[in-house]
Amino acid sequence: MAESDLWSVDANSALELSLVEPTEDGLTTVTRFHPRFTYPLFGEEEQIFGYQDLKINLQYHAPDMRPNVKITHSKKFKSIGETQPTDLDALLQGYLPPVAFAKKREFEDAIRLMPADWTPPGEILSEFDGVDGAKFEIRRSNLADDASRQIIDRVQLLILLFIEGGSYIGTDTTDSLDRWDIFFLYNIKPSTTDGTSRYQFAGYSTVYKFFPLQRFPLEPKEAHENLELPSGEFPFSNLRSRTRISQFLILPPFQKSGNGSRLYRTIYDYCLRDPNVIEVTVEDPNEAFDDMRDVADLDFLRQKSEFTDLRINTDIHIPKQGAAPRGVVDEVKSEEARCLYRIAPRQFSRVLEMHLMSRLAETVRPTLVDDKVVAKPTKIETHEYDLWKLFVKQRLYRHNKEVLSQLDRHDRIERLNETLGSVELEYARILALAERRTQATSSNLKRKLDDDENTEGSSSKKARVEDA
């Protein structure tokens, strides 16, 4: 083993994060977890040089996410020339607020001073029951709010540790703070002693408003001559805007329970109620977020007649030569539905394609199972499938026109067919995921109804609640 290997530590293992709460006997750990990756801090190799038995314990006070860092090790490398151990304090100070480096006693004293009836900043948008009886709350605030901005400053490091390509948002430029909305997800734990509820931070999302240039109808000359600018302050909220989901994080202990979908759905519903929001977009989503978003949007739109009424026009004939026909799906009604529900064009097209694929006959519908035995398709079923493929190819061509236009006709057709095959598999996977989510939701609802019936049949509801 090389000398350097003796002094190199895997950063993902060395760094442990935890949520803690104070008790009469000291701090108690609510949950602990390790980062998904640490390359934004320690480089591509995710190694920390200069220590043996290194432990970096980053504790967060569960309600307000006040951080505290504790670093321990058995040995530290003695510097030789330019070869020096990683300066962990200096490195972490670039990512955490100064309060994170207070002594442990100061940290414990500070969090003990938090009032028992403390509540997170912002207005309550949603309350729901999670798995195993867990209760959650989603609140909305704004980055211009001091308490909310303080929490964001404390937790932004988590974005780098769990979101591929994640980045900080600026909290120092006061003139743009009110463009940022913040949506907090909290797990609520009722106290067994004083009747209050304890909040545990479970995740959050930041949403940015930007204001596109808009076209306005020409007005008579008199209107321009009499134009008066509004006096006083003019809030950004009064302007037509697009909203962009920027950061979106659910802490690992609260993942895989539908909490991400709940948070996304709440953000979308909030934006949908705002008459000034033109469109809801997402900034550089990763694959996991894309899947969650696809399933959530599909579930939502399938409840809307403006969407479900969109169908493939099977009266259209596909010529063997010449230009491909348009209007496979009514373009006007499709655009009206998209604008009504303020979904970005590409996202709406994808979800519509998924939905239409799910309505194809089983004899022609693409699936993840290659050897599935099905009946021979009829001509009508095959024709509808051909029209669906044409509909998808037309979008793919528009989206990749610059690249595809440089290929000859044969290569262009081959490339489109290859891409279509990948799209079919992707849609089949997402539709299967949506089906599993629907079944899980139905199962959870049935279990909850059964529990409610048992509770109503109890001779002492109060005792049952307290025992729980």
Curated annotation (Swiss-Prot):
Phenotype of the disrupted gene, per the record: Significantly attenuates virulence toward rice leaves by affecting appressorial penetration and infectious hyphal growth. Impairs the acetylation of ATG3 during germination and weakens the interaction between ATG3 and ATG8. Also abolishes the acetylation of ATG9 and thus impairs the ATG9 binding ability to vesicles during nutrient starvation induction.
Regions annotated as coiled coil: none
Pfam families: Hat1_N (PF10394)
Protein name, as recorded: Histone acetyltransferase type B catalytic subunit
Domain of life: Eukaryota
Positions of modified residues (Phosphoserine): S8
Classification lineage: Eukaryota, Fungi, Dikarya, Ascomycota, Pezizomycotina
Region of interest (Disordered), residue spans: 442-468
Role of this protein: Catalytic component of the histone acetylase B (HAT-B) complex. Has intrinsic substrate specificity that modifies lysine in recognition sequence GXGKXG. Involved in DNA double-strand break repair. Required for appressorium turgor pressure, autophagy and conidial nuclear degradation. During the germination process and upon starvation conditions, translocates from the nucleus to the cytoplasm where it acetylates ATG3 at 'lys-262' and 'Lys-267', thus influencing autophagy through controlling ATG3-ATG8 interaction.
